[in-house]
Amino acid sequence: PKPPAEAKPAAKPAAPPAAANPFEGVDVKDPIVISAATRIQASFRMHKNRMALKEKSIPKFSQVLKDMFVMEGSAVTFFARVWGIPDPVIKWFKDGQEVKQGPKHEIKFDDKDGTFLIIRNADGDDVGTYTCQATNSFGEAFDSARLALEVPAKCTKQPDNITVKAGGNFEIKVEIAGEPEPDVIWTKGKKEIDEGGRFSYEDSPDYSILRVEKAQAGDAGKYEIEIVNDLGKARAYCTVKVN
């Protein structure tokens, strides 16, 4: 018998055809090609920048504080929205001094990057500039707003009654308050006292003074002081005796 034929090695598969070069025949000096390449590079850089922003960001205010004008004795709420990566630490300040949580002040946060400063029973001591500070490891941001009170006109201290010798000088002082700053009207016997001659005034946000020189018998009597602003009015009285 014939010996078995030797097995022939399998034929190697044919090599795949070389992939076509997508840039073959492209003129890199063509203005259209240059413009397209520039746009692609710019888009890639923007994508990298966006990714970097997702990884880190200094704090930024997306909603800033607003100035507040409120009635004395009411509650005040300052609100801001601020974000950053990592999340910033928030602090509140009044005229440069940190505001701490307590019976007078409450600091709150919501789940949308919002922060609140609540001031209870606002009074004159609360007037000033409030600042929200946001800080993380990449930087800090600030925003500020003012608090002003609206206070009805009032007399904070009644004037004293006066006794003066004829020919002497005297003054009547009334202490006042109000925001907006009140006007003061002086009258005697229902007649307004005009400035000039023996009569002069000194006015400030906290007081008003009527000065009278060389007192005469006709200066004796009851003086009325009316304190007025847009929110209200008040009256004060004083009696003068001339000996």
Curated annotation (Swiss-Prot):
Residues 1-22 are annotated as: Disordered. Residues 35-62 form the IQ domain. GO terms for molecular function: protein kinase activity. It comes from the Eukaryota. SUPFAM superfamilies: Immunoglobulin (SSF48726). InterPro entries: Ig-like_dom, Ig-like_dom_sf, Ig-like_fold, Ig_I-set, Ig_sub, Ig_sub2. Residues 59-150, 151-243 form the Ig-like C2-type domain. Pfam families: I-set. Keywords: Immunoglobulin domain, Repeat. Residues 7-20 have a biased composition (Low complexity). This protein is the target of CAVP, which binds to it in a calcium-dependent manner. This is CAVP-target protein.
